[in-house]
Curated annotation (Swiss-Prot):
The keyword Cytoplasm applies. Keywords: Amino-acid biosynthesis, Aromatic amino acid biosynthesis, Cytoplasm, Transferase. NCBIfam families: aroA. Monomer. This is 3-phosphoshikimate 1-carboxyvinyltransferase. The lineage of its organism: Bacteria, Bacillati, Cyanobacteriota, Cyanophyceae, Synechococcales. Phosphoenolpyruvate binds at residues 25, 99, 128, 175, 355, 397. SUPFAM superfamilies: EPT/RTPC-like.
Length: 437
């Protein structure tokens, strides 16, 4: 199939079997970054072999870090250059479509005194806000410049000596927090990050494992302090399956009559399990099988069976723990009798696309009744959806969400730009074909 051809989406049938989702995207990025600035070799098992982590690896290679090719099923090794070993690159660092790469690179590079870096990306990334990282870094003495007063790429980073300080983040964002923690490793004194509410904590867990002098305190773990000077040492990292990718199968298994799915080896970090809480609120039949701890992260297998679902509501307080799952939950809401309400989700308007607008547009094309709000949407479920021509609008999470919606529609659908799924889940279409009967 050509890259831009429309894909025929299946309807009807049920989903049965076992599936392993790709490695967690957040943990994949961080294992590459922390391995790069550690002493010695880091080996990474289960790294997500998709476009975004590949962008992170390419940027690190351009600064002298040895990283083996990222291929499905292969262990990746990173030859660390130490905390101050990153070289000034000869070219612009291309972050592709990856907001995580760009935001974490800003923190990584801000304290490289005397070295100059330019970060750029694709058309979508050039529209995404970066001041939320640049501003807190500036309070540490960072010099980050770009379009729209430093908010939009391309961004130039002139490495400076950073000062340790107390930094309040404007939003509960793991990307913002992680950028500051990376910068804090090279500052001239201790740095404390204070979040408005706790975001995913993969960076804190992994930095500690690599040997950083990092403490978590305050209410709900919202105060994270780093003392510079510790040497990071290469580690063996095992990347669990990404719960944000598992979410598509959790919702599909709950929605599609006759379904019984087991999703293996899923990361169950409590800062990421909002999706399980909302599905529980809906009455979904989900069981955690064989919960275990792997390389400092809680992991388990998730079994989901079809059953009736109730409408839901959730808002700002849970949003940091399920921000990437809002698109697929908006699909689930269409099949619950009654009104579901999502609020506190304005962050979705500055993702790869305006995800609230795109999901509302695509689901309305199928006949859904949706009212969009500035920070969310109200969905009146229970109306039958009809198959139609759909478009991912280049967003990976939209592509996979619409594939699940199409399973429940009357009549066939097509999806334009279905290749977007590869950003986080390169084997999604193969897995869907295998599980669908």
């Amino acid at each position: 199939m050509s890259a831009s051809a429309s894909r025929d989406l299946k309807t009807g049938g049920c989903l049965q079997g076992r599936v392993k989702v790709p490695g967690d995207k957040s943990i994949s990025h961080r294992s590459l970054l922390f391995g790069a600035i550690a002493e010695g070799t880091t080996t990474i098992e289960g790294l997500l072999p998709a476009e975004d982590p590949i962008s992170t690896a390419a940027c690190l290679r351009a600064m002298g870090v040895g990283i083996t090719p990222i291929e499905a099923g292969k262990i990746v090794t990173v030859e660390g250059v130490g905390l101050d070993g990153l070289q000034e690159p000869q070219h612009i660092l291309d972050c592709g479509n990856s907001g995580t790469t760009m935001r974490l690179m800003l923190g990584l590079l801000a304290g490289r005194a005397g070295r100059h870096f330019v970060l750029d990306g694709d058309a979508s990334l050039r529209r995404r806000p970066m001041r939320r990282v640049g501003q807190p870094l500036a309070s540490m003495g960072a010099d980050v410049r770009g379009r729209d007063n430093g908010n939009l790429a391309p961004l130039a980073v002139q490495g400076t000596t950073l000062r340790g300080t107390i930094v309040g983040t404007p939003v509960a964002s793991a990307q913002v927090k992680s950028a500051i923690l990376l910068a804090a490793l090279t500052a001239d004194g201790p740095t404390t990050v204070i979040e408005p509410s706790q975001s995913r904590d993969h960076s804190e867990r992994m930095l500690r494992a690599f040997g950083a002098n990092l403490e978590v305190g305050g209410e709900m773990g919202r105060h994270i302090s780093v003392k510079p000077g510790a040497t990071l040492h290469g580690q063996t990292v095992v990347v669990p399956g990404d719960i944000s990718s598992a979410a598509f199968w959790l919702v599909a298994g709950a929605l599609v009559p006759g379904s019984d799915l087991t999703i293996e080896n899923v990361g169950l970090n409590p800062t990421r399990t909002g999706i399980l809480e909302v599905l529980d609120q809906m009455g979904a039949n989900i069981e955690i099988v064989h919960p275990r701890d792997v390389a400092g992260e809680p992991v388990g297998d998730l079994r989901v069976k079809h059953g009736p679902l109730k409408p839901f509501q959730f808002g700002e307080e849970i949003m940091p723990r399920l921000v990437d799952e809002v698109p697929i939950l908006s699909v689930a809401a269409c099949f619950c009798d009654g009104e579901s309400r999502i609020s506190g989700a304005s962050e979705l308007r500055v993702k790869e696309t305006d995800r609230l607008a795109v999901m509302a547009r695509q689901l309305k094309a199928m006949g859904a009744e949706i009212e969009e709000h500035e920070d969310g949407m109200t969905i009146r479920g229970g109306r039958p959806l009809r198959g139609t021509a759909l478009d991912s609008e280049t967003d990976h999470r939209v592509a996979m969400s619409m594939a699940i919606a199409a399973l429940m529609a009357s009549g066939p659908s097509t999806l334009a730009r279905s290749e977007a799924a590869a950003v986080s889940y390169p084997t999604f279409w193969d897995d869907l074909a295998r599980l669908h009967s």
